[in-house]
């Protein structure tokens, strides 16, 4: 008996972006849930976030249409960045010289897994520690006059 397919991929090739810059963003979203991934990509200030978020949307749409899975059950299981082709141009310089310009491209693959269909992944996901710290700080009121005039000193 064949296993039911629980993972769906989305692939985008020849993105005009360096592979190292894309890996910086991909490493942050690997292993996270679909909603958490979209929030992270929305708030990160990098240029690589836009094509990666489009790929995450596409992978979720593929999972919805191919397997009929709910987007709340999706987890980014596989995310990889490979180097693509490098376009070479030449910039004309003084006295007949030219400097080479390399336009690097990359290929990004994102795999999305439905955790409701996979029993083994549910057990691992329940044991996983959260990545944020559960530290709560309390606000303490300080009386400024009792401390002294700190701002008057030069």
From Swiss-Prot:
InterPro entries (alphabetical): Ribosomal_uL22, Ribosomal_uL22_bac/chlpt-type, Ribosomal_uL22_bac/org-type, Ribosomal_uL22_sf
Highest taxon listed in the record's lineage: Eukaryota
GO terms classed as biological process: translation
Pfam family, one: Ribosomal_L22
Major location (coarse): plastid
Family (UniProt): Belongs to the universal ribosomal protein uL22 family.
Subunit annotation: Part of the 50S ribosomal subunit.
Protein name: Large ribosomal subunit protein uL22c
Native source organism of the sequence: Jasminum nudiflorum
